[in-house]
Amino acid sequence: MFPRVSMRRRSAEVSPTEPMEKGNGKNQTNRICLLVALSLFFWALLLYFHFVVLGTSNIDKQLQLQPSYAQSQPSSVSLRVDKFPIEPHAAPSKPPPKEPLVTIDKPILPPAPVANSSSTFKPPRIVESGKKQEFSFIRALKTVDNKSDPCGGKYIYVHNLPSKFNEDMLRDCKKLSLWTNMCKFTTNAGLGPPLENVEGVFSDEGWYATNQFAVDVIFSNRMKQYKCLTNDSSLAAAIFVPFYAGFDIARYLWGYNISRRDAASLELVDWLMKRPEWDIMRGKDHFLVAGRITWDFRRLSEEETDWGNKLLFLPAAKNMSMLVVESSPWNANDFGIPYPTYFHPAKDSEVFEWQDRMRNLERKWLFSFAGAPRPDNPKSIRGQIIDQCRNSNVGKLLECDFGESKCHAPSSIMQMFQSSLFCLQPQGDSYTRRSAFDSMLAGCIPVFFHPGSAYTQYTWHLPKNYTTYSVFIPEDDVRKRNISIEERLLQIPAKQVKIMRENVINLIPRLIYADPRSELETQKDAFDVSVQAVIDKVTRLRKNMIEGRTEYDYFVEENSWKYALLEEGQREAGGHVWDPFFSKPKPGEDGSSDGNGGTTISADAAKNSWKSEQRDKTQ
C-alpha cells in the first residue's frame, strides 16, 4: 500500500522548481511594463522640455531681436501683415499676440510655407504707406540716369506686325493709288527712282522722285536703322507700330464701302490690345506714321458716302500718337510731320554742300508761286495770288494745271524756288502743301496766309517764333484786296531778309528725310526730330502719372492747336489772335447740319486733294 500512498502523495506534491518558473514569468512581464512606462515618462519629459521650455525661450529671444533690426534701418515704412492660421503652443504664460499692425523699416519676409497640394499658398498682403505707386514703365525711365548708356531714355521697341499691315501692301503696290502707279515710288526704300541732274539744279547725289505720300515706308525703313532699338519693351521710351496706314486707306478711298475701309484699322487695334506691351500705358506710349492728311482717317459717320476711315476715332487709337503730314487743329492724337522732299542725303557732307550752295545763289525774283487756281472754292485766295504774280515785274508764276506742265517736273519747281527770295504758300486743298518744304529746301523764305499751313502744324520741326524764318499775311488781307504782296515784302529790310534766309537754310536738315539706308552722323533729320518729340511726349506723360498731375489745366481738345504754342510753364490755353482761323462754322454756315462744319469742310478738302493728285500725278 505504501507504494500506492506514495504515488498519491507524489501526485499531490509540487516540484520545487515549478513555482519558481511561474514566479519568474510574472516578474519578467512586470519588468517589461515598468521599462515601457519609464521610457514613455522619459520621452514625455524630454518633449515637454524641448517644446515648452526651450520653445518659449526662443520666442522671447525673437521678440527681443526685432526692435534692434528695426533700429538698424534708415527709413520707416508702416505695413500691415496678414496673419497665418497656425496652432498656438500650450504656454499659458505666453498668449499669442493680438495686434497684427507692426511698424518696421523694411518688410520682414514671412516664413516659407509648407507645401500643401490641397490649397494654393497666398503670401501676406502688404500695403505700403508713404510710398508712391509703382508703374511698369519705371525701368524705362531709370535708363535716363545711366550715363554710361548712350541709349538711356531713347530706346524704341518696334512691334513685329503681321505682314498684311505693311509689306504685303508693297508687294501689291499697283493697288496703292487709283491714278498713280506707286510701284516705282516704293523703290529705294520708299524714295522712288533717282533724279538725274541734267539741268544742274540738284546736287549729284541724294535726289529722288519721291511721292509726297510715301512717308509711311520711308519712316519705317528709317526706323530699321535707328541706333537704339530694343527687344525689351520694358526699356522702351516709346513703342513704334509699323502700320502703313496711309497706303492702306489709299487703296479703298474710291469705290469701296466703309467696312472695307475700316477693316485693317480694326484688325490692327484688336492685335495691339492683345499684346502685353499695350498694358504698360494702354497705348499712350505707342505711335505710328501715316503719310496722308488727317482727314483721310476721321470719318464722322457710318454713311457710305462719308469720306475716309475712322482709324483716328477708334477709342484705342485715341490713346496712340499718329504722325501725319497734316494734323487736325481740333484733336489731340495726331501730330504734323514734314512732307517728304526730293532730297535724301546719305552723308552729312551732302547736307553741308547743299546748304552752302543755297547761301551763294543769286535770286532774281522777289517772290514766286507754283500752283493752280481753285475756282470751285470761293474762300480760296489762289486766284488773287496768281493775279498779283502776273501783274508784278518782280514776281514769278509757275502755273500748274491738267496735262503736261513744268509744275510736274521737280527740276522746274526747284529752279524757280532757288531763284526767289520769297515763296508764296497759300492753303492747298487742305491747310498744308508739300511745296512749303520744297521751297525751304531751296533756301526760299516762305510766305504763309493761314497759321494752319505751318505754325500750328509742324511745331516739332519749326521755331515757335515764326517771324524768324517766314512772313505771315492774313488771308483776309488778300481776299479783300487790302494789301499788295509785293509792297508788303519790299518793306522788309535787306539785312533782315538775309538773316531770315540764313535761318531757313539752317532749318534744312530737320525738314528732310535722310536716306533710310543710312544715317546722318551729326545732323538731326525730320525722322530724328519726330522720334525725339514722341519720346519727350511719352516721358512727360509718365512723369506726370507718377506725380499724379496733368500737363495742362482744363485741357480742351477742341483747342489742341493752342497748347504747342504755349510758353514754358503755361498750363492753360486762353484766347488767341488766331482763334478766327480755327473757329468751326455753325450748322448750316458751310452747308452742313451736323455741327461739325470745320471737319466736314476738311473732309471735302481731302476729296479735292485726291482730285489734285490725279491732276498732278508724275508718271
UniProtKB/Swiss-Prot annotation:
Q: Which residues cross the membrane?
A: 34-54
Result for mutant: residue 539 to I: In mur3-5 and cie1; stunted growth
Q: Which residues lie on this side of the membrane: Lumenal?
A: 55-619
Query: What does the record say about the knockout?
Result: Stunted growth.
Question: Which spans does this entry mark as compositional bias, Basic and acidic residues?
Answer: 610-619
Q: Which GO terms describe its molecular function?
A: glycosyltransferase activity
Enumerate the subcellular locations listed in this protein's record, separating them with semicolons. Golgi apparatus, Golgi stack membrane; Golgi apparatus membrane
- Superkingdom of origin organism: Eukaryota
Q: Which GO terms describe its biological process?
A: endomembrane system organization; fucose biosynthetic process; protein glycosylation; salicylic acid mediated signaling pathway; unidimensional cell growth; xyloglucan biosynthetic process
**Location of region: Disordered:** 1-26, 576-619
Q: Which InterPro entries match?
A: Exostosin (IPR004263), Exostosin_GT47 (IPR040911)
Which Pfam families is this protein grouped with?
A: Exostosin_GT47
What keywords appear on the UniProt entry? Glycoprotein, Glycosyltransferase, Golgi apparatus, Membrane, Signal-anchor, Stress response, Transferase, Transmembrane, Transmembrane helix
* Residues glycosylated per entry: 116, 146, 231, 257, 319, 465, 482
Membrane topology qualifier: Single-pass type II membrane protein
The answer, when asked if Cytoplasm is one of the entry's keywords, is no
For the keyword Glycoprotein, the answer is yes
Q: What induces it?
A: By salt stress.
Q: In which tissues is it expressed?
A: Ubiquitous.
Please explain the role this protein plays, according to its UniProt record.
Involved in the attachment of the Gal residue on the third xylosyl unit within the XXXG core structure of xyloglucan, the principal glycan that interlaces the cellulose microfibrils in plant cell wall. Associates with other xyloglucan-synthesizing enzymes to form multiprotein complexes for xyloglucan synthesis in the Golgi. Interacts with actin and is required for the proper endomembrane organization and for the cell elongation. Not involved in the trafficking from the endoplasmic reticulum to the vacuoles. Involved in salt stress tolerance.
Q: Tell me the domain comment.
A: The cytoplasmic N-terminal domain interacts with actin, while the lumenal C-terminal domain contributes to the activity of xyloglucan galactosyltransferase.
Q: How does it assemble?
A: Interacts with CSLC4 and FUT1.
Q: Which PANTHER family match?
A: EXOSTOSIN HEPARAN SULFATE GLYCOSYLTRANSFERASE -RELATED, XYLOGLUCAN GALACTOSYLTRANSFERASE MUR3
Q: Return the protein name.
A: Xyloglucan galactosyltransferase MUR3
Q: Which organism is it from?
A: Arabidopsis thaliana (Mouse-ear cress)
Supply the gene name: MUR3
